[in-house]
Amino acid sequence: MRVSSTEEESYHQGTASMSTAGAVDDDGARFTPAPPQTSLSVTEPARETPVHAVTQVLVVGGGPAGFAAALAARRAGASEVLLVERYNHLGGLSTGGLVIWIDRMTDWSGRLVIAGIGQELLERLPAHAVAGAPRELWGSTEEDPVAYWRERQGAFRDTVTWSPMIDPEWLKYLSQEMLIEAGVKFLLHSWVAEPLFDESERRLRGVTFESKEGRRAILAEQVIDATGDLDLCARAGLEFEADAKTGGSASLIA
């Protein structure tokens, strides 16, 4: 490894940090990497990276979006789906971050308006792993139920809603089981390092990732970026939409 500098300064080994912060412009999203904290640069030696797998669909990120994308892709007929997650569990912030409250899956009349895979998962959880208003109270405006569920984040605007809280450990387990049942393969403890970008077609063709086994690559026909900040698309220079006010972004197929 060679270290170079544009200034006369020495290189000291020690704790290093890397920022992946970016700026979102007012018109949409433009990834702007944070500037380095030094003028040093490192030249890494060229190397061949072994290909761990070749798959039809690769999903990067095992949070709620990545979980649903992988499951939906397999159910839609994809022959092979592989999901890569950096932590030791699925669920993202829902499980590891303890964001276990789902805000209003019903409208003010009590009609279920957010369903699909999310509701399927909730219905498969054991009763003791989900806390929320019973179905017969959804949309109720009666004083006593509203007062009771308001204290439990289940009633708003004097209306009882389906706003469940979920046991995060059960959510980890069931998410994994549902992927296994569907035939989705997944890698945990695997941090995606770089996108493999096809300049001629302007699309992602895979990724390199790091794990206990070192750096490897995955090649795919389709890549779904389900990272929290669309890290892959940003690094590849692809355009994407983001919410300038909240910094949120949507998953993207590239």
Where are these regions (language model features)?
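The conserved SAM/SAH-binding core of class I Rossmann-like methyltransferase domains
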Residues: 60, 84-85
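N-terminal Rossmann-fold NAD(P) dinucleotide-binding loop
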Residues: 66
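Conserved N-terminal/central alpha/beta ligand/cofactor-binding core
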Residues: 16, 22-31, 36, 46, ...
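Core beta-strand elements of the Rossmann-like FAD/NAD(P) dinucleotide-binding domain
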Residues: 53-55, 213-222
